[in-house]
Every structure is written in C-alpha cells, then in structure tokens.
Amino acid sequence: MANSQRKILVTSALPYANGPIHLGHMLEYIQTDIWSRFQKLRGHECHYICADDAHGTPIMLKAQQLGIEPEEMIAQVNKEHQQDFADFNIKFDNFHSTHSVENRELSGEIYLKLRDAGFIKTRTISQLFDPEKSMFLPDRFVKGTCPKCKSEDQYGDNCDNCGATYNPTDLIDPKSAVSGATPVMKDSEHFFFDLPAFENMLSEWTRSGAIQDEIANKLAEWFEQGLQQWDISRDAPYFGFEIPDAPGKYFYVWLDAPIGYMGSFKNLCDRREDLNFDDFWSKDSTAEVYHFIGKDIVNFHSLFWPAMLEGAGYRKPTSVFAHGYVTVNGAKMSKSKGTFIKARTYLDNLDPEYLRYYYAAKLSNRIDDLDLNLEDFAQRVNSDLVGKLVNLASRTAGFISKRFDGKLAKIADTTLEETFLAKQEVIADLYENREFGKAMREIMALADIANAYVADAAPWQLIKDEAKQDEAHQVCSNALNLFRILVTYLKPVLPKLADDVEAFLQFPLTWDNLGADLAGHEIAKFKALMQRIDMKNIEAIIEASKDNLQATTEAAPEKKAKKSAETADVAVDTRSPLESDPISDEISFDDFAKLDLRIARIAKAEHVPEANKLLKLQLDLGGETKQVFAGIKSAYAPEDLEGKLTVMVANLAPRKMRFGMSEGMVLAAGPGNKDLWILEPHEGAQPGMRVK
C-alpha cells in the first residue's frame, strides 16, 4: 500500500448524448480508468464519476428528427453508452446524466451565487434567427460561404478549408442548417459571465502546475488578447435548464455540463452514507479532484470552469489533464475508409483488453495525438500480451498441474523476483504521472527477462530427467511467480485478464502482496487466457464501419463519378492545396537518393531575437547533435516543440547565417504563417533512423 491514503475524485469529459461512443472517445475513458484503477490498487480512496452531457440544440433537433421527446432519446443513449463502457471494462463509481435533479439544483445554485456576487451581466445582442423554425441559430447551425477563402458550405464559426474564424453574420449567403431558410437578424437579451473579473486568479492558476505546460502556453493567447465576458444563455426553444428568474432563457450547455461532474458525485453521495459531498468540493477541501479531457475543450475546463467555481465559493480542480486526438492508420477517422470505428463494432469482433493495452502502450502525459495503426496494433498485442505475457504461464503451468499436484515450490533463488519487485516504485511513479507507455515498456522488459529465463532453463527438457524434477519444479514455480507480478503490474490496464489470472492462481493480485511467498500454494488447472489477433477480425471491423456510399451516388446523379485511376487523371478539388501549389517537375530516383532524411528529437528550441520567423533548434540524432534554424516561429512556441520527434534533411550543406550556422532542415507542411505543421513520425521511430 502507498504510504498514506489519499482521497481522490477523478472524472472524464462527459460524452454527448446524441450518438454512439467510438474509438476516439474510448482513448480518454481507458486512460482515466487505468489511472483510477491504479489509485485503488495502491489503496487510495478514489471515485471515478462521469455522466452523459444531455443538453443543447443538437439533442433537441435530433430528437425532433426521430419524432420522440429529448428525454426519451437521452435515456436510450445513456443506456447504450453505459453498456459500451461496461463492455470495455470501464469501471465508473457512478455514471449519471446532466439532465438530472442534482444538476438542475447545483446549476441554479452556482448561477445565483455568481449573480448575487455581481459576476453575471446582461446586454442585448443581435443574432441570426430562423424565421421558419422561430429559433435563434447557434454558430454550427448556420452555413454559407467563407468570407475569407470563398469556400462554400462552411459553418458559422470557422472554415474547414482555410481555418479562418469569424462570426456567423460574416458568412456570405448564410442559410439555416435546420430549415434551409435565409436567416434574419434579431435582438435578444443575453446573460454573460464576467470572466475578466477572474483574470489575475486564472493567470496564476494556469501557471501553477495545475495544467500541462503546453496547455498553459496555449491559454496564454487568451490572456494576451484579453479575456471576454462569456455568453451563458440561450433562447427558447432549447433543451436544457431554464435560468432562474428568466422565463424563456436557458443555460448554455457548457455552463451546466461541467457542473455535471458535481451532479454525478452528489448523486453518488446521496446513495452512500460513507461519502460527503463537501469533503471533495468545499473551498477548504483537502481531497484531490482531477479532470481528464481532450485538448479541444481545455478553454472550458481551464478558464471558464475554475472561474465559475471560484466565484461560487467552491474549490478548483487539483489538475486538468489533456490528451490528443486519435488517428487511425495515420489519418483522421474516416467513415468511407471504415476507420471511424464505433465501440460496439469493435466489441463485436475483438477483445476490449487488446485496445486497452495498445492505448496504454502509446499514452504519455503530453497532448500528442495517438495513432491507432491497425497492423501495429495486431503485432504489438500478439507479441507483448500473447507471445510474452500469457506464454510465460502457458509454457510452465501444465507441468505444475501434471507433475507436482498443482502446488508451487519454495523458490530457492529469489534473484529474479527481487529484480521484478525492485521496479514496483518505478512503475508506480509512471502510472501516477500518466506515463503509461513508459510503464508498459518497463513491464515488457521484465517479461523479456522472465521468458529468457524459462527458455534458458528449458523445463520441458528438465521434466524428462527424473534427477531434475526439483529443478523443473523450481523453474516453473519461479516463472509463475514472475508472471503473477507482471499481471499485478498490468492489472489497471488488463482488469479482465487479472481476474482470470486470480482464478487460475487462486490468489488475489494486489500491490500489497507483490512479494508474497506462495510456497506450497495450490493453483487451478491452466486455461487459455488470451488469443492472438487475426487480421480477419480487423478487416471485419473496417468493413462493418464503412458507409454505404452507393446511396449517396444515386441520390446525386448530376455529380459525375470520378474516373478510374487506371484510365484518367483524378480531378483536383478546388479547395485542395494541390490547386495553389501543384506538384513539382519529376526528378530521378538518383536525385532523391542523395537526400539523407533522418529522425531527430528536438532537444532544445529557442527564439532568435534578431529574426521574426526563425526558431533555433538543437536536433538530437541519437549520438550527434545538429543546429538548425527553422522558419516556423509563426506556428510554434519553442516550449511546444521540445521533446518532439521530427524529420530532418541531415546531409544538407551547412549554411552560415548571421545568427549562426544552420546544419540541416526540418520538414514541415502547410501554406505558411500559423498554418505550418512539422512532420512527426510514428512514436516507434528513434533518433538517427533513416527515413526511406
């Protein structure tokens, strides 16, 4: 057990109640569940709570499309979400809904405290209004032509093509996405939360270590531009909570959504006599509160939410942990390619523990995106879990049952056990700091040691020699003891496997009994614990996830189908980068072969005071360091680059600049200014590797 018991409340971001869970969502819930299970394994009081985010215009409109009431729809979605989570072995202490009595009461209470303290302001604003549906239109429910690049069919807040942000009123030829009608301008009184009043507190809190440095650096832009009052109201019709003393006005979904953390925990406390809500949420609480979220919602959790809590007299979160997005096979999830995979589709074909392990093996405490490479996924699971971990037991357990009455021997040489136990605090620290990938590497390195031990000892040979029965008994018992330690270390990641191993070993796997002496202990007969992934199962997932594009083609016959790549050129999308920056003239392979492209880690990045566009980078090639001046200052802060892997031209002739010598070039994509992205290789790549 850990030195002293901590009181911890941990949350994941609330899934929106208008659709199913997919594998992009699952990253966060798996990450949080692993961390929560680890805390409990260490003996801490840890409560993992969540809820469906059940309010807002999208839910109201989706229910209308289905011809049912929003309450009916969110109840059905809640049931589906809970089943998906349960089948992925996500163990919430409570999963609730923001459309609850507890959340209504807490939202009203917090709002009134903010209002009475002078933090709520009102003013009249003009918004686009759908005259056919008699409703004001949120940003994402207005579409039109981008005022910057003139791309059609863009949302009312930003352009998917050029990345520009703007107001819905800036769109050219705007249309309601609800009815197709041309919206009109209409005035309405709105309620605003006075976020600027908390600027000093937020400036200090965001630099206190409560959030990752990358996030703090990003939020610095908000402070540089000056915090603005936050619109927290929406007009009827709207599915949500009506604002106290304001008929026809509703809380914006992002006001009551984070309060849903409190509402879900209040619901749990009301059902348990041993839990007190104020112990975790009062201003003077000594408990720890952690939020796991995606990097796309950091502004809500790291600015608006702590300010609301501060203004209403509650404690702020201990930390907010953000993670990156999930890509599949190096690209954004795609319905047409079958890589937009729903949790249920995955569960119909593969063991959830496979994905839990793969995500854990690639997760760090940074906000880098995680790529689910499906071939690598199969290879890593088959190699690590089946080939290394489970194989350790399958190669030795049968001998214990058949030759030694199922009983383990007293281990004479405990050298290996001591090596394994010496890693427990290293592994614990990695779990604690959310460095799951590093923890998995430590554990698999131990698995390699154990397998090498068994291979060298060859109990299948020893067992044939009557004079070496004791030695065979020792080897098999030692191997199973090492296997027990490994599975205990992996228990937060692989809870179902751990349950099965506990049944097989007939012994509980806890952190406290890692060093237990199992001499004379009887185990059950070994049964297969895990099967290898067959690529046919992955192919089945992809096929089941593909959209039926035939209907789309038939519904729009006036749109010509693209010609076969074998018979004609593929037309260039007018919004494609190829349109403005065509492919260069062909070069010979010999010309290309002259380039020496290498993986490099950005060891250090710093500003060049004399240059407006350059950053000075120290690139580690795994034994050699090169200095490069890169024109990426408009897109990156130096601190956001340090530690990242990238690709560089390593054999470019050094170029003397007035700031110093540049010894190569890093590769980046994009048109320029803020739209630049350095190339980041798969995390399996190592500094110094050649790109070929």
From Swiss-Prot:
Residues in coiled coil: none
E.C. numbers: 6.1.1.10
GO molecular function: ATP binding; metal ion binding; methionine-tRNA ligase activity; tRNA binding
GO cellular component, one term: cytosol
BP-aspect Gene Ontology terms: methionyl-tRNA aminoacylation
Enzyme type, top EC level: ligase
Entry cofactors: Zn(2+)
Binding site for ATP: 335
tRNA-binding domain location: 591-692
Subcellular location: Cytoplasm
'HIGH' region, short sequence motif: residues: 15-25
Reaction equations catalysed: tRNA(Met) + L-methionine + ATP = L-methionyl-tRNA(Met) + AMP + diphosphate
Chain sites annotated for binding Zn(2+): 146, 149, 159, 162
Signal peptide: none
A Pfam family matched in the record: Anticodon_3
UniProt keyword Kinase, yes or no: no
Biased composition (Basic and acidic residues): 556-566
Keyword entries, A-Z: Aminoacyl-tRNA synthetase, ATP-binding, Cytoplasm, Ligase, Metal-binding, Nucleotide-binding, Protein biosynthesis, RNA-binding, tRNA-binding, Zinc
Region (Disordered): 552-577
Motif ('KMSKS' region): 332-336
PROSITE patterns per record: AA_TRNA_LIGASE_I (PS00178), TRBD (PS50886)
Quaternary data: Homodimer.
Function (record text): Is required not only for elongation of protein synthesis but also for the initiation of all mRNA translation through initiator tRNA(fMet) aminoacylation.
UniProt protein name: Methionine--tRNA ligase
UniProt organism field: Shewanella sediminis (strain HAW-EB3)
